[in-house]
Amino acid sequence: VRIQNVSVVVVSAVCLLATGCSDGVSGKDDGAKPKPTHSVLPQRLDKPAPMPEGELQPSPAADAAFSENLAYELRRKTQSMAGATGKITAECPKDLGSKSGTTATCTTTFEGVKVEWNVSIGGKSSFSNNLVEFTATPRQGILTRDGVARLLYGNYRDSIDYALCNDIPKAVIAPLGVQSKYRCEVVFKGKKPSGFSQPVRATDSGPRYY
């Protein structure tokens, strides 16, 4: 069933904030201490350009099917997870309707890195009958080189000179919410690398460093 002129509203954002966000400052950790690497990490990350303002493009047409509107929302969530710009695609079952209780698997890609999402359709929004609530949970996370750089320079602002990491790719699949194999060290202005680094983690709302 193709539903015309129906928009979607994200209700999973509340869960994302509760489980993945720390108001952008992840220098506060859960007891983990920096780990000595005994050598300077090989990859230098300089300050990235700001994320572009405005809506992610292209956006759905006014008469887009429900599945297209949902795919667009998942593209936005994928960009938030990556914390970076890049080629993003999304695909949901074309016959996916907006009936409450419907479940489906959708797929997004960021620079060719694929993420599958468990999607559950809810009821009509209390704001409008043209808005449909849904939850979308990624099965995997994404880490990006630019996303990690943007996080570190955003957290440490004017105190950071540069960051060193162990070769984070442009984009790579990573487990959600747990320590990944990638690590970074923040080098402060006027200082030299110490050899102490901390792990980088993927979350559904962007990378974290602790």
Segments predicted by a language model, with ranges:
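C-terminal motif of bacterial Sec signal peptides marking the signal peptidase cleavage site
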Residues: 17-20
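Extracellularly exposed regions in secreted/surface proteins, prominently low-complexity, repeat-rich
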Residues: 33-35, 151-210
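Bacterial signal peptide processing site
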Residues: 22-25
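N-terminal export and membrane-targeting signals
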Residues: 1-11
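Short, non-transmembrane alpha-helical segments in secretory-pathway proteins
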Residues: 57-89, 141-168
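Acidic (E/D-rich), amphipathic helical modules within compact regulatory domains
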Residues: 90-137
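Serine/threonine-rich, repeat-prone extracellular segments and beta-strand-based repeat modules
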Residues: 86-105, 166-178
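N-terminal low-complexity, Pro/Thr/Ser-rich intrinsically disordered segments
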Residues: 32-73
